[in-house]
């Protein structure tokens, strides 16, 4: 295994570095933390009936574990590898998580050292039948990562071109097929493939000028619902907030009405969430009026002929009488800073 190994979190394909980081980022954010649950998306066609799941170390006498790189020492080894009651390796994304955990310290240790560490860990924690297969997958994974370096973008490649990005993702899928069978691909790369495709479809929706903002919200909500349940929940929580901000800006830029905003929110989040957001809007409007009145009165104090000490005392009294809670007082002071900076810049 010659050549420099590129950590999966920082794959470099020349000019497409930023593209892959964009596409792979979501996978790492929403990657299931423990992988100890029965994951339908990764194990439903792999796990035999009546299989008893066991952690890699549950019923195995551990051998000598590798010495971790300095940055990993003190952390829990992220290797949620599972074996069945017969000591056979169960294919889950936890295998890949294990490999990536060790390779995240590339630079502190060489590729060869990290491969040796992973082998040592697998041999120490897995029964022989499982460790042999896991080591085979490790060798294939390293070879796969090396092969990714040979991918070349097409001439005129642009990172905001959805079709060009789709070709990159399709190329990656073809490379995976060179090193893994269908079950292995589903286990190791199933989440990533689903999330990459989700991201591309999301870009297509935003780029579609024939869709209204409400229609975009509806399509995005459908897109999230089409993800496997294990992924959809995490994506929904994080992505809906970002989409809400972007679609709100679109409506405001077009001079949309309050009803336009309401319709978009209902399509994206549902009526109950839309009700809550309207309440937040009303509370924010009241707050904005209150703080604007306070800042205006504060400006009058600052423009007065009183000495600095008297001004500060008057402002403190005004602030305390205008805002009734500690949180509002702190927030008001933050607005003061922004207001003063804006005044100096004008």
Swiss-Prot record:
It is a single-pass membrane protein. One of its GO terms (molecular function) is unfolded protein binding. Keywords: Cell inner membrane, Cell membrane, Chaperone, Lipid degradation, Lipid metabolism, Membrane, Transmembrane, Transmembrane helix. Pfam families: Lipase_chap. The chain crosses the membrane at residues 10-30. It comes from the Bacteria. InterPro entries: Lipase_chaperone (IPR004961). GO terms for biological process: lipid catabolic process; protein folding. The keyword Lipid metabolism applies. SUPFAM superfamilies: Lipase chaperone-like (SSF158855). It is found in: Cell inner membrane. One of its GO terms (cellular component) is plasma membrane. The keyword Transmembrane helix applies. Belongs to the lipase chaperone family. HAMAP family: Lipase_chap. May be involved in the folding of the extracellular lipase during its passage through the periplasm. This is Lipase chaperone. It comes from Acinetobacter venetianus (strain ATCC 31012 / DSM 23050 / BCRC 14357 / CCUG 45561 / CIP 110063 / KCTC 2702 / LMG 19082 / RAG-1). The lineage of its organism: Bacteria, Pseudomonadati, Pseudomonadota, Gammaproteobacteria, Moraxellales. The gene is lifO.
């Amino acid at each position: 295994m010659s050549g420099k190994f590129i950590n999966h979190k920082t794959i470099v394909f020349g000019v497409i570095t930023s593209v892959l980081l964009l596409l792979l980022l979501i996978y790492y954010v929403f990657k299931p933390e423990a992988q100890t649950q029965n994951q339908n998306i990764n194990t439903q066609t792999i796990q035999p009936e009546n299989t008893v799941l066991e952690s890699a170390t549950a019923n195995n006498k551990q051998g000598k574990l590798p010495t971790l790189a300095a940055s990993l020492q003190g952390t829990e080894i992220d290797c949620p590898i599972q074996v069945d009651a017969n000591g056979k390796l169960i294919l889950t994304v936890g295998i890949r998580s294990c490999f990536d955990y060790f390779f995240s310290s590339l630079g502190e240790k060489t590729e060869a050292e990290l491969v040796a560490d992973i082998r040592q860990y697998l041999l120490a924690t897995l029964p022989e039948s499982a460790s042999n297969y896991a080591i085979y997958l490790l060798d294939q994974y390293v070879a796969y990562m090396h092969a990714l370096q040979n991918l070349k973008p097409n001439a005129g490649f642009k990172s905001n071109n959805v079709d060009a990005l789709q070709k990159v993702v399709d190329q990656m899928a073809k490379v995976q097929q060179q090193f893994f069978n269908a079950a292995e691909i589903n286990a190791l790369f199933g989440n990533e493939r689903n999330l990459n495709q989700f991201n591309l479809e999301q870009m297509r929706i935003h780029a579609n000028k024939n869709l209204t903002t409400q229609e975009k919200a509806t399509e995005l909500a459908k897109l999230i619902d089409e993800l496997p349940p294990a992924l959809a929940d995490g994506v929904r929580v994080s992505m809906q907030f970002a989409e809400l901000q972007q679609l709100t800006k679109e409506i405001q830029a077009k001079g949309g009405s309050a009803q336009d905003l309401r319709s978009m929110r209902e399509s994206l989040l549902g009526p109950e969430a839309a009700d809550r957001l309207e309440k937040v809007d009303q509370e924010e409007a009241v707050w904005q009026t209150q703080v604007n009145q306070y800042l205006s009165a504060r400006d009058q104090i600052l423009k007065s002929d009183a000495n600095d000490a008297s001004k500060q005392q008057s402002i403190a009294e005004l602030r305390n009488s205008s805002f009734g809670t500690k949180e509002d007082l702190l927030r008001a002071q933050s607005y003061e800073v922004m207001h003063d900076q804006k005044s100096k810049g004008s």
